[in-house]
Structure formats: C-alpha cells, structure tokens
Design a protein with these regions (language model features):
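N-terminal interaction/assembly modules
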Residues: 1-127, 132-134, 138-171
C-alpha cells in the first residue's frame, strides 16, 4: 500500500519522481567516486548504465554528476564559506555530497528552481544520512542561496524562475 502512495499520479509528478531517483543515484555515484578513486567515466558506465534507456534522465544525471566533479573546488569553497567552526574535510561524506549537489544545481542548472534544488538536497541528506543532516544541509544551502541571490550570481530562467522573489528581481 505504501508504494502506491509514492507512485506519481501525473506527468509532472513522474518527472519529479524520476529526478529524485536520478539525484539519489548521483549521490551514490559521487560517493563511489570519492571512495574508489575510479574515473568518472568508469563510475558512469558501472553505476549509471541502467538509466540509458531514458535519454532525458540519463543526460540530467550525467550532467549533474560531471558538473559536481568539474566544479568541485568552487563548490567546496562556497560551502566552506558558510560552515562556521567547521572544516569541509570534517563533514560527513554524505552531507558533503548532498551539499555539493545542491550548490551545483543552484549555480549551474538555471532551469531548476532554487527551492527544488534545496529541498532535494535536504531529502538526500535525510534519506542517506541522518534527520539532523537534513537540517544542517537546509541551513547551509539557504545561506548559500541568499548570498548568490544578493550578489547577482543566481542565474535562473524558465522554470528556474518559479521562485517569486527571483521573478520580482528580474522584472
């Protein structure tokens, strides 16, 4: 019975459901990348090949995975600037990866609404780490979002402008 409640009822919910599954897999792939030291290409072929039949999902996941890796230094610098009394190296790996995914979406995926990126990162942290991790990820990403918005570094368009505060700033 529980499964039926989690299944999507509309095309929009189906896309959201797929995207959540993709983000979960990307988190797992980034974890494997950190732990194994294998190349991104190997990780993609080994852990993401089952998504190749759905081209849109595969491209989103591949792009998210590679964007985190390609921009990891900048992403980590942004995260480090918002974690007071912590060093990024001391964060739980899952929390760090969830934050990286959230920051990557905020910075490099202009079509994704900021609230979606933040919420999805929170859900990843809660599912794969702890309930407290969700609150931590929420606080850090909220601070990052506010700074990006205030400094004009939040480049959102299309669906990414669903956030009313962004729409007002652009008008």
């Amino acid at each position: 019975m529980r499964i039926e409640k989690e299944l999507p009822n509309s095309e929009y919910e189906e896309v959201s459901f797929k995207r959540r599954l993709i983000r979960e897999r990307v988190l797992q792939m980034l974890y494997a990348y950190e732990i194994s030291g294998n190349s991104p290409e190997f990780i993609l072929s080994d852990l993401f090949s089952d998504f190749q039949s759905d081209k849109e999902s595969y491209e989103f996941g591949k792009s998210l995975f590679l964007s985190v890796i390609e921009n990891i230094d900048e992403i980590d610098r942004i995260i480090a600037s918002k974690i007071k009394n912590w060093e990024i190296e001391r964060l739980a790996l899952i929390d760090k990866i969830a934050l990286r995914i959230g920051v990557c979406e905020l910075k490099y995926f202009p079509e994704i609404p900021p609230k979606v990126s933040i919420n999805e990162a929170i859900e990843l942290a809660k599912k794969f780490s702890t309930e407290r991790s969700g609150k931590f990820v929420n606080g850090v990403l909220d601070a990052i979002y506010n700074e990006l918005r205030e400094t004009g570094q939040l480049n959102k368009y299309g669906r990414g402008l669903i956030d009313k505060s962004l729409r007002k700033e652009r008008d």
